[in-house]
Amino acid sequence: MQEHLIVTLDGTDYLVEPGTSLLEFIKSRDTFVPSICYNESMGPIQTCDTCMVEIDGKIERACSTVVNRPMTVNTQNNDVKASQKEALDRILEKHMLYCTVCDYNNGDCEIHNAMDAWGLEEQSYEYKTKPYEKDYGPFYRYDPDQCILCGRCVEACQDIEVNETISIDWNREHPRVIWDNDVPINESSCVSCGQCATVCPCNAMMEVNMEGNAGYMTDTEPGSLAAMIDLTKKAEPGDGLLFAVSDSEAEMRKERIKKTKTVCTYCGVGCSFDVWTKDREVLKVQPSHDSPANKIATCVKGKFSWGHINSDQRLTKPLVRKDGEFHEVEWDEALDVIETNFKRIKNEYGGDHLAFIASSKGTNEESYLMQKLSRQVFGSNNVDNCSRYCQAPATKGLFRTVGHGGDSGSIEDLERAAMTVLIGTNTAEAHPVIASRMKRAQKLFGQKMHVFDIRKHEMAARADAFYQPKPGTDLVWLGAATKYIIDNDLHDKAFLNDWVDNYEDYYKSLELFTMDFAEETTGIPKEQIISFAEEAAKAESMSICWAMGVTQQDIGSDTSTAISNLLLVTGNYRKPGSGAYPLRGHNNVQGASDMGSMPDQFPGYQKVADDEVRAKFEKEYGVELNPTPGRDNHQMMEGIHNGDIQSLYLYGEDTGIVDSNINFVQSALEKVDFLVVQDEFLTFTATYADVVLPASPSLEKDGTFTNTERRIQRINKALQPLGDSKPDWEIFQLIAQRMGADWNYKHPSEIMDEIAGLTPSYSGVNYERLQGFNSLQWPVAPDGTDQPTLYMDGFNFENGRAKLFPLTFDNFFKEDEVYDLHVNNGRLLEHFHEGNMTYQTEMIKYKVPNAFVEISPELAKDRDIHEGAELRLISETGEATLIATVTDRVKGREIYIPLNNDAMSNGDLGAINKLTNSDVDKYTDTPSYKRTSCRMEVLTRKGKSPLNPTNFRVDKQRNPQYSVQVQKKWERPDYVFPGNVVDK
C-alpha cells in the first residue's frame, strides 16, 4: 500500500491518502473554494470552473484533480481569486439573482451561497436572457433563463439514474438542457424520477409544487412577479445587501416550511429523504448523500406521489354499517361495536375463530402489535401479512440453505458485483432505484447483467444476455447450470469444503437436469445455458436478484432454493458483491414478517411451537400462549367458507383485490360474520366491512420500516393525522384496552424497546441509534453492532455450515386448447400494486389512468386486433375486460396485465385477480399468480390506446451518452478557461 503523500495547502503541510479528491481534501480542512457544479454523490463534472486553485504554480480545477503526487496548493492568492471571480461572473451572466422572490431561496441555493461566501460585490458581465420559454412537465419544470449549464441534471439522468433522457445541446448559439432529441419534457422518455430537480444547484430545475409556494412573495401572478423581480434587482444590485435581505427572508421561511426525515412508503428499496411541508402541503422530497439505501436517487412515486396524504377520499371518521349502509360515527361508538362482536365471537366460538391480517405498509411497531393483539388478547395464531402473497417462498428457500430469510448483503453489493443475474424481476419498474444502481454499474464499470424473464422489460433490453424461459421453468435451467458447473470442475471446492454440507445428496438430485432436458423444458438453447454457467462460475462475484416471477409460482420455494444452491456451489456468499437478493415488494414486507405477523412464528422467526421461546413471550405478555400454528391468509379465506373463521380484522391490505382468485375471496368477505377494515381509504375490501377505521399514513406517525436489505430506518411524523384518523398502533391499543389488556404505550419507541427485548435479531435496535439518516441492518447485537453482510461468522445453522438442498422437477406447464393464452402480471413504475395510494396523485393518474393488457404483434396479427382493442379475458375462475396495447415487450401467446386498476373508482372490472386461480406453492401457500391461463373474446378490434401518448413507453427515443460531454463546451469558440484570463 502506497504511503501518504504530502500536500501543502496554503502553506501548511498535510498527509493525504493517494487517490483522494483534491476538492474533498480542501473541504475537509474547512477551506472555502467555490464548486457549484460539484456534488459529492456524482463527482467532478468540470463545467462551472469555479473551483480554480493553484497547483504547483498552475491554475487548475480542484474537482477533477486527484492527489497522486506531492503537491503545493494555493487557494488564496490573487491569481486564484481572479480566476474564481471570472468563473463566478460567467455564471451570473446566465443566472439572474432575484433571491428574495425566488422559490429556491431556502438556504441551499448553491449559486447564492457560493457568491455570498466568496464575497462577490458586483458582477462583471451583464445577465443575458435566453430565447427559450419555461418547459413544464407533470412534476417539475425547467427554466432555461436561470440555467447555468452546470450539467448536474445530465450527470444524474445519464450516469446515476441511467434513464438517459437529458443532455445539453452544446452546439446551439445559446446552449440549453434538452430532453431526448429536443422534445418537451412531457413528451419525452423521462420517467419523472425527479433526480434532476434534486441535484440542481439553483431554481432552474424545480419541483412544480415548489413554484409559487415556498416564499413569502413568490405566489404572485407572472406579470406582478416580473415587476417584483425587476424591483428586487434594483434593490439588490449585486452587493452584500442582496444576500442580507434574501438571507433574512430565507430565515423567515424556516418558520413555515418544515423538513422531516422519513422513509418512502412504497416499494422495498427503503429510500429515505427529507420531506418539505408547508401546512399540510408536500412541497418537495429531498434525498441526501447520507440516505443509506438510495443516496440522492428517488423514483416518481417516492419523489412525487404524495397526493394520498390530503386526498378528499381519505377517511377521517370511523364508519359503522347500519341497515346495509355506512354511517360516520365517533370513535367510542365504533369501538363499542368492535368490542361487542369480538367478545361475542371469542366467547361463543373461541379465539381461534378470529383472524388478523397485518399490513406491509405499516410500521414494524404496528405489525408487532397486531400479532400481539392476536396472540395475547385473543389466543389466536391466525395472523399473517402480505409476504404470503409474494416473498414467503424466497424466505423458505433461504431458510433451507443458509438460515436467514433476508437479503444476504446490501444494495451496495448489487453495484459492486462483477455479475448480476435477474430472474423474474422487472426491477426497473418494481425497484427502480436498485435498478439504477445496477444500470450504472453496467454502463460505467462493466458489470455483466444476465436477465431471465418471459417478458422483455427494460432490464432485459439492457442485459448483456437475455434469456426467455417458458413460464415456471426457472428451476430447470438453474439445476442444469449448476450441474454443468460441477461436472466441468468449475465449482468452488474450497468454499464447499469449508462451509457447506449435504453435497453428495444434492449432487445426486441433479441427475435429472441434463442440458437436453433443460433445453426441451425451458425452451432456452443449451448453448446459452452453458455460456451462462461458465460465466457464473468464473465471475469474481455474482449476485442474484429475484422477485414475483419466481415466487408466485407453485414451485416458488423450490426455485428460490435452486438459486441459493447455485450461489453456494459457486462460492457466492460471505463476500462483497455476492449473494441472494429476493427483492421485497413493499416498504415493510420484510419488517412485517420480522415482527411475527405470521401464523407459526413470533417476532424474529421464533417458532410458536418452541416451548422455550413461547415461555419467553408468555412471561412478557402475562398469558398462556397458543402453541399450535394458526392459519395463513389463504387458509383464512378457506376457513371463512368452511365456518371455522367468524371474524376477520385487517389493516392496510386490500385483500378483496390483491389476493388471487378474488371471486373466491370476495365471497368470503361477504360471508364472514364480522369484518373490521382499517385503512386510509374506503378501499374495495372496506366496502364489505361492518366497521371501517380511519388510519393515518406514514407522514402522520412515527415508527420504523425494514427494507429489502434488512435495513431498519426511522420514519418521523411530519403532519398531524387528518381529521379523526389515527396511527394504526394507537388503534390497536384502543381495541386491546377495550378487550381488557393493559396496554399503555405512549410512543412507538416504547414498542421497539419491547421488540428488542424479545427478538434476538433486533436486540440492539433503539430509536437513539436510528436518529437522522442512521440505520441498522439486522441481526443487531445488543451493543448496536449490525451485519450489512450476513454469514461472515458462519451460516445460521447450529454448526455454522450451509446446506445444499436436493430438488426435483415435475411441474410441466400444460397448454390448454381452450384457455390458450398465458397471463403474466406485475407492477408499473408509476403505480404501486392496485394503486389505492398512487391514483390519488393527479399527474400519476394522468400518465397511467387505467390498467391495460399488453399483447404481442404476433397475437395481434393472428386475432386481427389493433391498438386500443377492447378485450374480454376469461379464465377458469373469472373474467376481466381490458384495453389492449400492442408491444414487443411480450411475445407469442404471452400477455401482460399490470396490477393497478383503480378499484376504488372502477371496481374490479379490470382486476388481474379476477383471472388468477387458487393454486398455491405447497410449502408456503403463496398463490401461483403467474401460472394463469385465459382465453380471449374480442369486443372491439381497435380504439384509443390505453396509454397516454405522453407516457414514456410510447415511441420515445432516449439519448444515451456518458456524462455531460463537457469537452464540447470547452471546444466552443466563446469558451474561456478562467486560468487563461489570469495568464493574459
Swiss-Prot record:
A Gene Ontology term for the protein's cellular component? membrane
Q: How is the cofactor bound?
A: Binds 1 [2Fe-2S] cluster.
User: Which positions in this protein are listed as binding [2Fe-2S] cluster?
Assistant: C37, C48, C51, C63
Q: Where is this region: Formate dehydrogenase?
A: 252-984
Q: Where do the 4Fe-4S ferredoxin-type domain residues begin and end? A: 138-165, 181-211
Q: What's an example GO BP annotation here?
A: formate metabolic process
Q: Which Pfam families match?
A: Fer2_4, Fer4_7, Molybdop_Fe4S4, Molybdopterin, Molydop_binding, NADH-G_4Fe-4S_3
Q: What are the names of the required cofactors?
A: [2Fe-2S] cluster; [4Fe-4S] cluster; Mo-bis(molybdopterin guanine dinucleotide)
* One example GO MF annotation: formate dehydrogenase (NAD+) activity
Its recorded reaction(s) are:
formate + NAD(+) = CO2 + NADH
Indicate the segments forming the 4Fe-4S Mo/W bis-MGD-type domain, all copies. 257-313
Enzyme class, first EC level, given as a word: oxidoreductase
Q: Where, by residue number, does [4Fe-4S] cluster 1 bind?
A: H95, C99, C102, C109
Span of domain 4Fe-4S His(Cys)3-ligated-type: 79-119
Q: Which UniProt keywords apply?
A: 2Fe-2S, 4Fe-4S, Iron, Iron-sulfur, Metal-binding, Molybdenum, NAD, Oxidoreductase, Repeat
Tell me which EC number(s) this protein carries: 1.17.1.9
PROSITE patterns recorded for this chain? 2FE2S_FER_2, 4FE4S_FER_1, 4FE4S_FER_2, 4FE4S_HC3, 4FE4S_MOW_BIS_MGD, MOLYBDOPTERIN_PROK_1, MOLYBDOPTERIN_PROK_3
In this chain, [4Fe-4S] cluster 2 is annotated as bound at C147, C150, C153, C200
Q: What is this protein called?
A: Putative formate dehydrogenase SH0748
**From what organism does this protein derive?**
Staphylococcus haemolyticus (strain JCSC1435)
